Amino acid sequence: FQNYLSPGWQAKFFFTLKEAKRLGLGIDMTMGTGWPLGGPTITEKEAAKKYQFVDGVFTTGLTGQKVKRAAPGGEGLVLDHFDMKAFAKYSNNFVPLLKKAHSPLRAIYNDSYEAYGSNYTPDLFPAFQRLNGYDLRKHLDVLSKKKAESEEENQIFADYHRTMSTLLQRNFALPFDHWVNSMGFTSRNQAHGSPVNLLDIYAAADIPEAEF
């Protein structure tokens, strides 16, 4: 095996592009070797995160999820899709390769969200305050419940989910599409599994895609 993005891997990648062009074939590629996005360049700072309650106390940490079905050189933690800076750092790893890529490479593909248990990001509280006008930290007990017990709690749950949905759209779906286009390619996105209004996320991509 050639480790992902290694010089040997890149040599085979450019050979593949050359042969595909000779044969009249098109190529799309993912930004990784498995799903969701992530890999060896993702540190704990950029990795998917979660909140949980331990003995009634709100705590945060990593989900610990790794890239599924990763090929050699692509193993590692899953990206925090709610963090724009994390995505920017991750995508920068592909700039040198894609700047040298050429036709018939057509599209860059996000092979589904599926970041299980990722329900927190460091910008959650300030983003929640900006979007909803009140401090979620004063209502953390609501997040410890499986379901709301009042209209007020229903509203807090709704505001929390809307905030996470907004962060995913603004900090990943739209930046992914814009970045791919800026590199000269078409964006493809599988949005299923996302904790959002799926139509909004699919609309952000050039090619919205589902599994079949």
Model-derived segments and spans:
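Regulatory input/activation interfaces that engage signals or partners
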Residues: 173
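Acidic/glycine-enriched edge-of-secondary-structure segments
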Residues: 72-80, 181, 207-212
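Mature extracytoplasmic enzyme cores
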Residues: 3-160, 165-170
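Beta-sheet entry/capping signal
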Residues: 24-28, 103-107, 177-179, 184-188, ...
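Hydrophobic targeting/anchoring helices
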Residues: 36-41, 109, 183-212
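Surface-exposed charge patches
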Residues: 18, 178, 200
